[in-house]
């Protein structure tokens, strides 16, 4: 974490520059769940109800509406080095959890195009993760 002296806020800076690999398959698309970490929460419509499920070691939840999993290359972690610095800019370690929320199983949808019902599902997931913290 580093202090931005223009905005007077702390910002998170990825020390590895956050280069994303050029993948031939989209790891966020349904059917490619094995390309990501196991989900900690997947919302699934079953029997007319929204159920909260999670992946197991040898089983990935299918037909999910929203999926949450730990990032493969997290920017923050609960295991961090205590590296404070004053020069050239003030910095301190960033500590926390880095999750990926896949808001829709539809590859072409964006946050501005998903339905109100799907937005509601995303907010349920965010609320769940905040309560967990």
How does the language model describe each region?
Residues 1-133:
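Active-site microenvironments that recognize anionic phosphate/pyrophosphate groups
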């Amino acid at each position: 974490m580093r202090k931005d002296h223009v905005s007077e806020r702390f910002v998170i800076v990825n020390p590895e520059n956050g280069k994303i690999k050029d993948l031939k398959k989209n790891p966020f698309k349904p059917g490619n769940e094995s390309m990501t970490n196991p989900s900690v929460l997947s919302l699934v419509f079953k029997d007319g109800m929204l159920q909260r499920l999670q992946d197991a070691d040898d089983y990935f939840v299918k037909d999910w509406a929203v999926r949450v999993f730990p990032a493969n290359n997290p920017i923050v972690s609960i295991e961090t080095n205590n590296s404070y610095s004053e020069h050239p800019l003030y910095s301190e370690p960033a500590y926390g959890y880095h999750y990926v929320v896949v808001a829709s199983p539809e590859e072409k949808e964006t946050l501005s195009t998903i339905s109100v019902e799907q937005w509601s599902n995303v907010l349920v997931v965010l609320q769940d993760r905040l309560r967990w913290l």
